[in-house]
């Protein structure tokens, strides 16, 4: 069981080399994420289209494929207080991933080096590159 953040999901969905490493790490795992995960990932896919890294059609396909990932989305409300407590070292969005990982007692998988180096929490954070 793991928590997957948006940076790792985007790499996975865009089939980058880091995404291949994420796919290997996810094998056999039950994947969890906070509810805002979808908005973050779809926003990043949109940015890939805007930057012409992928076509509009490819973006639509990636979104459809993303929405079919077997990820358990958790409501934000139970984790918002902890996410706010992490405000001095994390964005609220990142804090929600950390809070969920802490709450479930499972690793947080990320491709975000800054998040992987963060402190002030009890989560195990794995940087996948």
Swiss-Prot record:
Keywords, ordered alphabetically: Hydrolase, Magnesium, Metal-binding, Nuclease, Toxin-antitoxin system
Binding of Mg(2+): at which residues? 5, 94
Pfam families assigned: PIN
Q: Which cofactor does it need?
A: Mg(2+)
In terms of CDD domains, this protein maps to:
PIN_Pae0151-like
Annotated EC: 3.1.-.-
Task: Output the Gene Ontology terms for molecular function.
Answer: magnesium ion binding; RNA nuclease activity
Q: Which Gene3D superfamilies match?
A: 5'-nuclease
Q: What class of enzyme is it?
A: hydrolase
- Family affiliation: Belongs to the PINc/VapC protein family.
What functional role does this protein have? Toxic component of a type II toxin-antitoxin (TA) system. An RNase. The cognate antitoxin is VapB12.
Q: Which PANTHER family match?
A: EXONUCLEASE VAPC9, RIBONUCLEASE VAPC3
Q: What is this protein called?
A: Ribonuclease VapC12
Cite the source lineage. Bacteria, Bacillati, Actinomycetota, Actinomycetes, Mycobacteriales
């Amino acid at each position: 069981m793991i928590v997957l953040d948006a940076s790792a999901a985007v790499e996975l969905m865009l089939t980058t080399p880091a995404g291949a490493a994420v796919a290997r790490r996810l094998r056999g795992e039950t994947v969890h994420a906070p509810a805002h995960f979808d908005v973050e990932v779809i926003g990043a896919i949109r940015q890939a289209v805007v930057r012409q890294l992928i076509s509009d059609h490819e973006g639509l396909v990636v979104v459809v494929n993303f929405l079919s990932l077997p990820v358990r989305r958790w409501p934000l409300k139970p984790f918002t207080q902890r996410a706010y407590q992490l405000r001095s070292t994390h964005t609220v969005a990142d804090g929600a991933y950390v809070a969920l990982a802490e709450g479930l007692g499972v690793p947080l998988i990320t491709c975000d080096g800054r998040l992987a180096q963060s402190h002030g929490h009890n989560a195990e954070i794995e940087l996948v590159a």
